[in-house]
Structures are given as C-alpha cells and as structure tokens.
Amino acid sequence: IELIKKTKINNYYIKNQEDFRKRIVEDINIDDDVLDIGKGMRDKFENIKSKNITTVDVNDFGDYPDIIYDICSDPDETLLKKFDKIVCLAVLEHVYDPFLAVKNIKLMLKENGVLYGYVPYLFYYHAPRSLKFQDYFRFSKDALSYLFKDFKSIEIFPIRGRISTPLNILFAGRWKKYIEKTGINILLDKFVSDTKNSEQCSGYNFIVKK
C-alpha cells in the first residue's frame, strides 16, 4: 500500500494532445550523458541539447545501436553509474524479465539520475511477425509502483482514458495514426472521472528518479 501511495499519478497526457518526448527533450541538459534503450527518441535527437547520446538494443539494425546489449543481462562495468538520463520507451513489455531489466537500468544511472519511459497496459499485441522481439507483458499502475519500488520517486502519466482506450484497440494502428490527431480522445475521456481514466488506460509514460 505504501508503494502505491508513493506513486504520483498525473493525467496531463489524457487531457492534452502532446508528445511525452517533448518533455524528455526539454529535461535533458547540454552536459548530460544519455542512454536511449531501443532508440525511441530517434527522430528527436537533433532537438536534444546534449550530444552525449548512446543507443542500446538487443538486435543489430545496421545503423544502430551503438552497443548491442540485452538489458536483462549484467551491464558492462563501463556502463555502471554512467548516465544522467536514460530513456526506455515501449521496451519493458518486450523483455523476458522486466524486474531484472529495471535493476540493471538503475545500476547504469548516476545518483539522482532520471529514467523516462513508456509501457502499455490495455493495449493490443504488437510483436513483429518476424519475432525479432516478442511481446510479453502489460503493466498496471500498481505494477509500476512495485517495479520501481527501489527508486526515490515515481510519477506516472496515463495515456488515453476509459473510453478512448478500447477504441484504440478496436481500430489498432488507425486510431493513433489518423483519428486521435483530431483530439476526439480528449473530448470522449472528459465524460469519465480522472481516477477511472487513470486505471483503465492504454498505457503509462513514467518518470522515476534514482
């Protein structure tokens, strides 16, 4: 119960049509060492003030990553306490041991370092047909409280509310790409309380501090 109380819930991204990555770009300082796991910030690199950006992935995609590394395995000593900011967008659902992955991410963060991420909750299956990576897990707000229990602070940002979440599943891919851009999801979810929207959502952005 104390872990759940420790978690701050912020409904900003249910009520505003804004990319969470904008917040990440704004938070990164010019002298920060940054690790992007899965390269979820790839199209934002030119907007990031710091140029000390390292990319990591379990697969080799040719032009990235800088380091091929399974985050469920022990990190190289050169990566320990190296990074001020770590970004992990839509990755933890694809690893076979998210608890071990988070433990290793914490080891790579400097003291007071910050982890930014996203995980799905009520969301459709989305492993590629090639099975280059798999789709293992979904995370409720309570799961995130426990997953990040060893961090100083946890703030989670629900994505989509109780009404727009099933529509996103029903119109998989098309909802986000076309319909959601009109802002109709914000209008629909206004008919539901903040609490219900935060509990019956598509997924969560999160910011946790070591």
What do the PLM-derived regions correspond to, one by one?
Residues 1-81, 85, 201-204:
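Conserved N-terminal segment of class I S-adenosyl-L-methionine
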Residues 32, 112-113:
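Surface-exposed loop/turn positions
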Residues 74, 89, 131-132:
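Conserved short-loop catalytic and cofactor-binding motifs
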Residues 36, 88, 117:
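Redox-cofactor binding/interface segments in oxidoreductases and associated redox assembly factors
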Residues 40-44, 59-61, 72, 93, ...:
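Short, solvent-exposed loop/turn segments at secondary-structure junctions
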Residues 96-100, 104, 114-209:
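S-adenosyl-L-methionine-dependent methyltransferase catalytic module, highlighting the catalytic core
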Residues 85-91:
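A short beta-strand submotif of the Rossmann-like class I SAM-dependent methyltransferase core
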